[in-house]
């Protein structure tokens, strides 16, 4: 028997206090505040952050009455930046707001006067969805573990078990996989990388010991670790200055962290700060729903789907499927199954996936496809 091929694959994730992630969360907090009062809000909200300053800018058309200052400060407080000693303070930071109405040229192209089903796509673009059978969540193990390491650090910071932790954290996980005719089978964890912002008083040696014991060993399945697993915990040594003080932040700069950790192609459009009329978000969620449904139905072990849209046109212009040789049917047959089971017009997706609700802030941390409670994570029963 020939030895099956193994390979290494890596994904990274970042914590809630990473400057780009702060911006994603602020943008989605504003979106949620709009949708809470007006489900038909049209929102394209960007955020930028640097030392002592948050700026929100973009186009919002809504009947909602918003206190932007309060929304921004509440979001930063929840993340955990409540003291300038941590590099950022929700109480004293400067909040700048430059929000205008949606362009009437864009609005007229979407045909709001028609029924919701015929709502045109809010822009052109390509979206990808991906699913794999290697984890119950249908996500690559690399990105799932990278997210879980950051989640565990946030929990340990909030419950006081690691009180020296600060909100800005980064993780990276390398898994050794076996390629089983296109299916990815995780064999072992090759490398774990963690960098965590910390209080000044803890030594690097103590920090490394505690992160290894209280984070790595609790999150990573023991049977995936071996004597050859490599650990790079706080490889830079000191990391006291973090968050927006250490680095500027922008909405939409962590789109690989938000999605599939590099295991799938990327459409290029970010998710956060956009309402459901923006297919960058709604159609990417739908593509995940389709991919996950195909794997759950046993039609394939791993799949990527691509959709494309044009502004003002409701129906997608194209569908593409790649099952990596893991499918029980041809790709053409699978495309027909998708067409038969899914209506991919944005105005239909908003109803089927219930997207006109204030549900988006939690998606802005630890990936948009990690929380299994979301509608797009629940596979549809397919007829074929």
Curated annotation (Swiss-Prot):
Heterotetramer. It catalyses: L-methionine + ATP + H2O = S-adenosyl-L-methionine + phosphate + diphosphate. K(+) binds at residue 46. HAMAP family: S_AdoMet_synth1. It comes from the Eukaryota. Pfam families: S-AdoMet_synt_C (PF02773), S-AdoMet_synt_M (PF02772), S-AdoMet_synt_N (PF00438). Its cofactor is Mg(2+); K(+). Coiled coil: none annotated. ATP binds at residues 18, 168-170, 236-239, 247, 253-254, 270, 274, 278. Transmembrane segments: none annotated. Keywords: Acetylation, ATP-binding, Magnesium, Metal-binding, Nucleotide-binding, One-carbon metabolism, Potassium, Transferase. It is an enzyme of class 2 (transferase). Its EC number is 2.5.1.6. This is S-adenosylmethionine synthase 2. The modification N-acetylserine is found at residue 2. Belongs to the AdoMet synthase family. In yeast, there are two genes coding for AdoMet synthase. Present with 22000 molecules/cell in log phase SD medium. The keyword Transport does not apply. Pathway: Amino-acid biosynthesis; S-adenosyl-L-methionine biosynthesis; S-adenosyl-L-methionine from L-methionine: step 1/1. GO terms for biological process: methionine metabolic process; one-carbon metabolic process; S-adenosylmethionine biosynthetic process. GO terms for cellular component: cytoplasmic stress granule; cytosol. L-methionine binds at residues 59, 102, 247, 278. Binds 2 magnesium ions per subunit. The magnesium ions interact primarily with the substrate. Binds 1 potassium ion per subunit. The potassium ion interacts primarily with the substrate. Mg(2+) binds at residue 12. GO terms for molecular function: ATP binding; metal ion binding; methionine adenosyltransferase activity. It comes from Saccharomyces cerevisiae (strain ATCC 204508 / S288c) (Baker's yeast).
């Amino acid at each position: 028997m020939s030895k099956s091929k193994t390979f290494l694959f890596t994904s990274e994730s970042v914590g809630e206090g990473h400057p780009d992630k702060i911006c994603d969360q602020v943008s989605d907090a504003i979106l949620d505040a709009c949708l809470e009062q007006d489900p038909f809000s049209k929102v394209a909200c960007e955020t930028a952050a640097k030392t002592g300053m948050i700026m929100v800018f973009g186009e919002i058309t809504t009947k909602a009455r918003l206190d932007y200052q309060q929304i921004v400060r509440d979001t930063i407080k929840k993340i955990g930046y409540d003291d300038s000693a941590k590099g950022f303070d929700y109480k004293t930071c400067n909040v700048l707001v430059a929000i205008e109405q949606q362009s009437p040229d864009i609005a007229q192209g979407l045909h709001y006067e028609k029924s919701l089903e015929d709502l045109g796509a809010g822009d052109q673009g390509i979206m990808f969805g991906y699913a794999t059978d290697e984890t119950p969540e249908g996500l690559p193990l690399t990105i799932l573990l990278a997210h879980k390491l950051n989640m565990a650090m946030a929990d340990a910071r909030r419950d006081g078990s690691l009180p020296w932790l600060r909100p800005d954290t980064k993780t990276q996980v390398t898994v050794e996989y076996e390629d089983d005719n296109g299916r990815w089978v995780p064999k072992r964890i090759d490398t774990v990388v963690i960098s965590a912002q910390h209080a000044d008083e803890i030594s690097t040696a103590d920090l490394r010991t505690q992160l290894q014991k209280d984070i790595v060993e609790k999150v990573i399945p023991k049977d995936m670790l071996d004597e050859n697993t490599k650990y790079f915990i706080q490889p830079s040594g000191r990391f006291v200055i973090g968050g927006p003080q250490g680095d500027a932040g922008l909405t939409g700069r962590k789109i690989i962290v938000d999605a599939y950790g590099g295991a799938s192609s990327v459409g290029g459009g970010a998710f956060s700060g956009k309402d459901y009329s923006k297919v960058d978000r709604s159609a990417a969620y739908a593509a995940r729903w389709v991919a996950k449904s195909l794997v759950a139905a046993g039609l394939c072990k791993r799949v990527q789907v691509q959709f494309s849209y044009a502004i003002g046109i409701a129906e997608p212009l194209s569908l593409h499927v790649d099952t990596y040789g893991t499918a029980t049917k041809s790709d053409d047959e699978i495309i027909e199954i998708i067409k038969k089971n899914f209506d991919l017009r944005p105005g239909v997706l908003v109803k089927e996936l219930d997207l006109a609700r204030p549900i988006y802030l939690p998606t802005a941390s630890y990936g948009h496809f990690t929380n299994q409670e979301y509608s797009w994570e629940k596979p549809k029963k397919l007829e074929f």
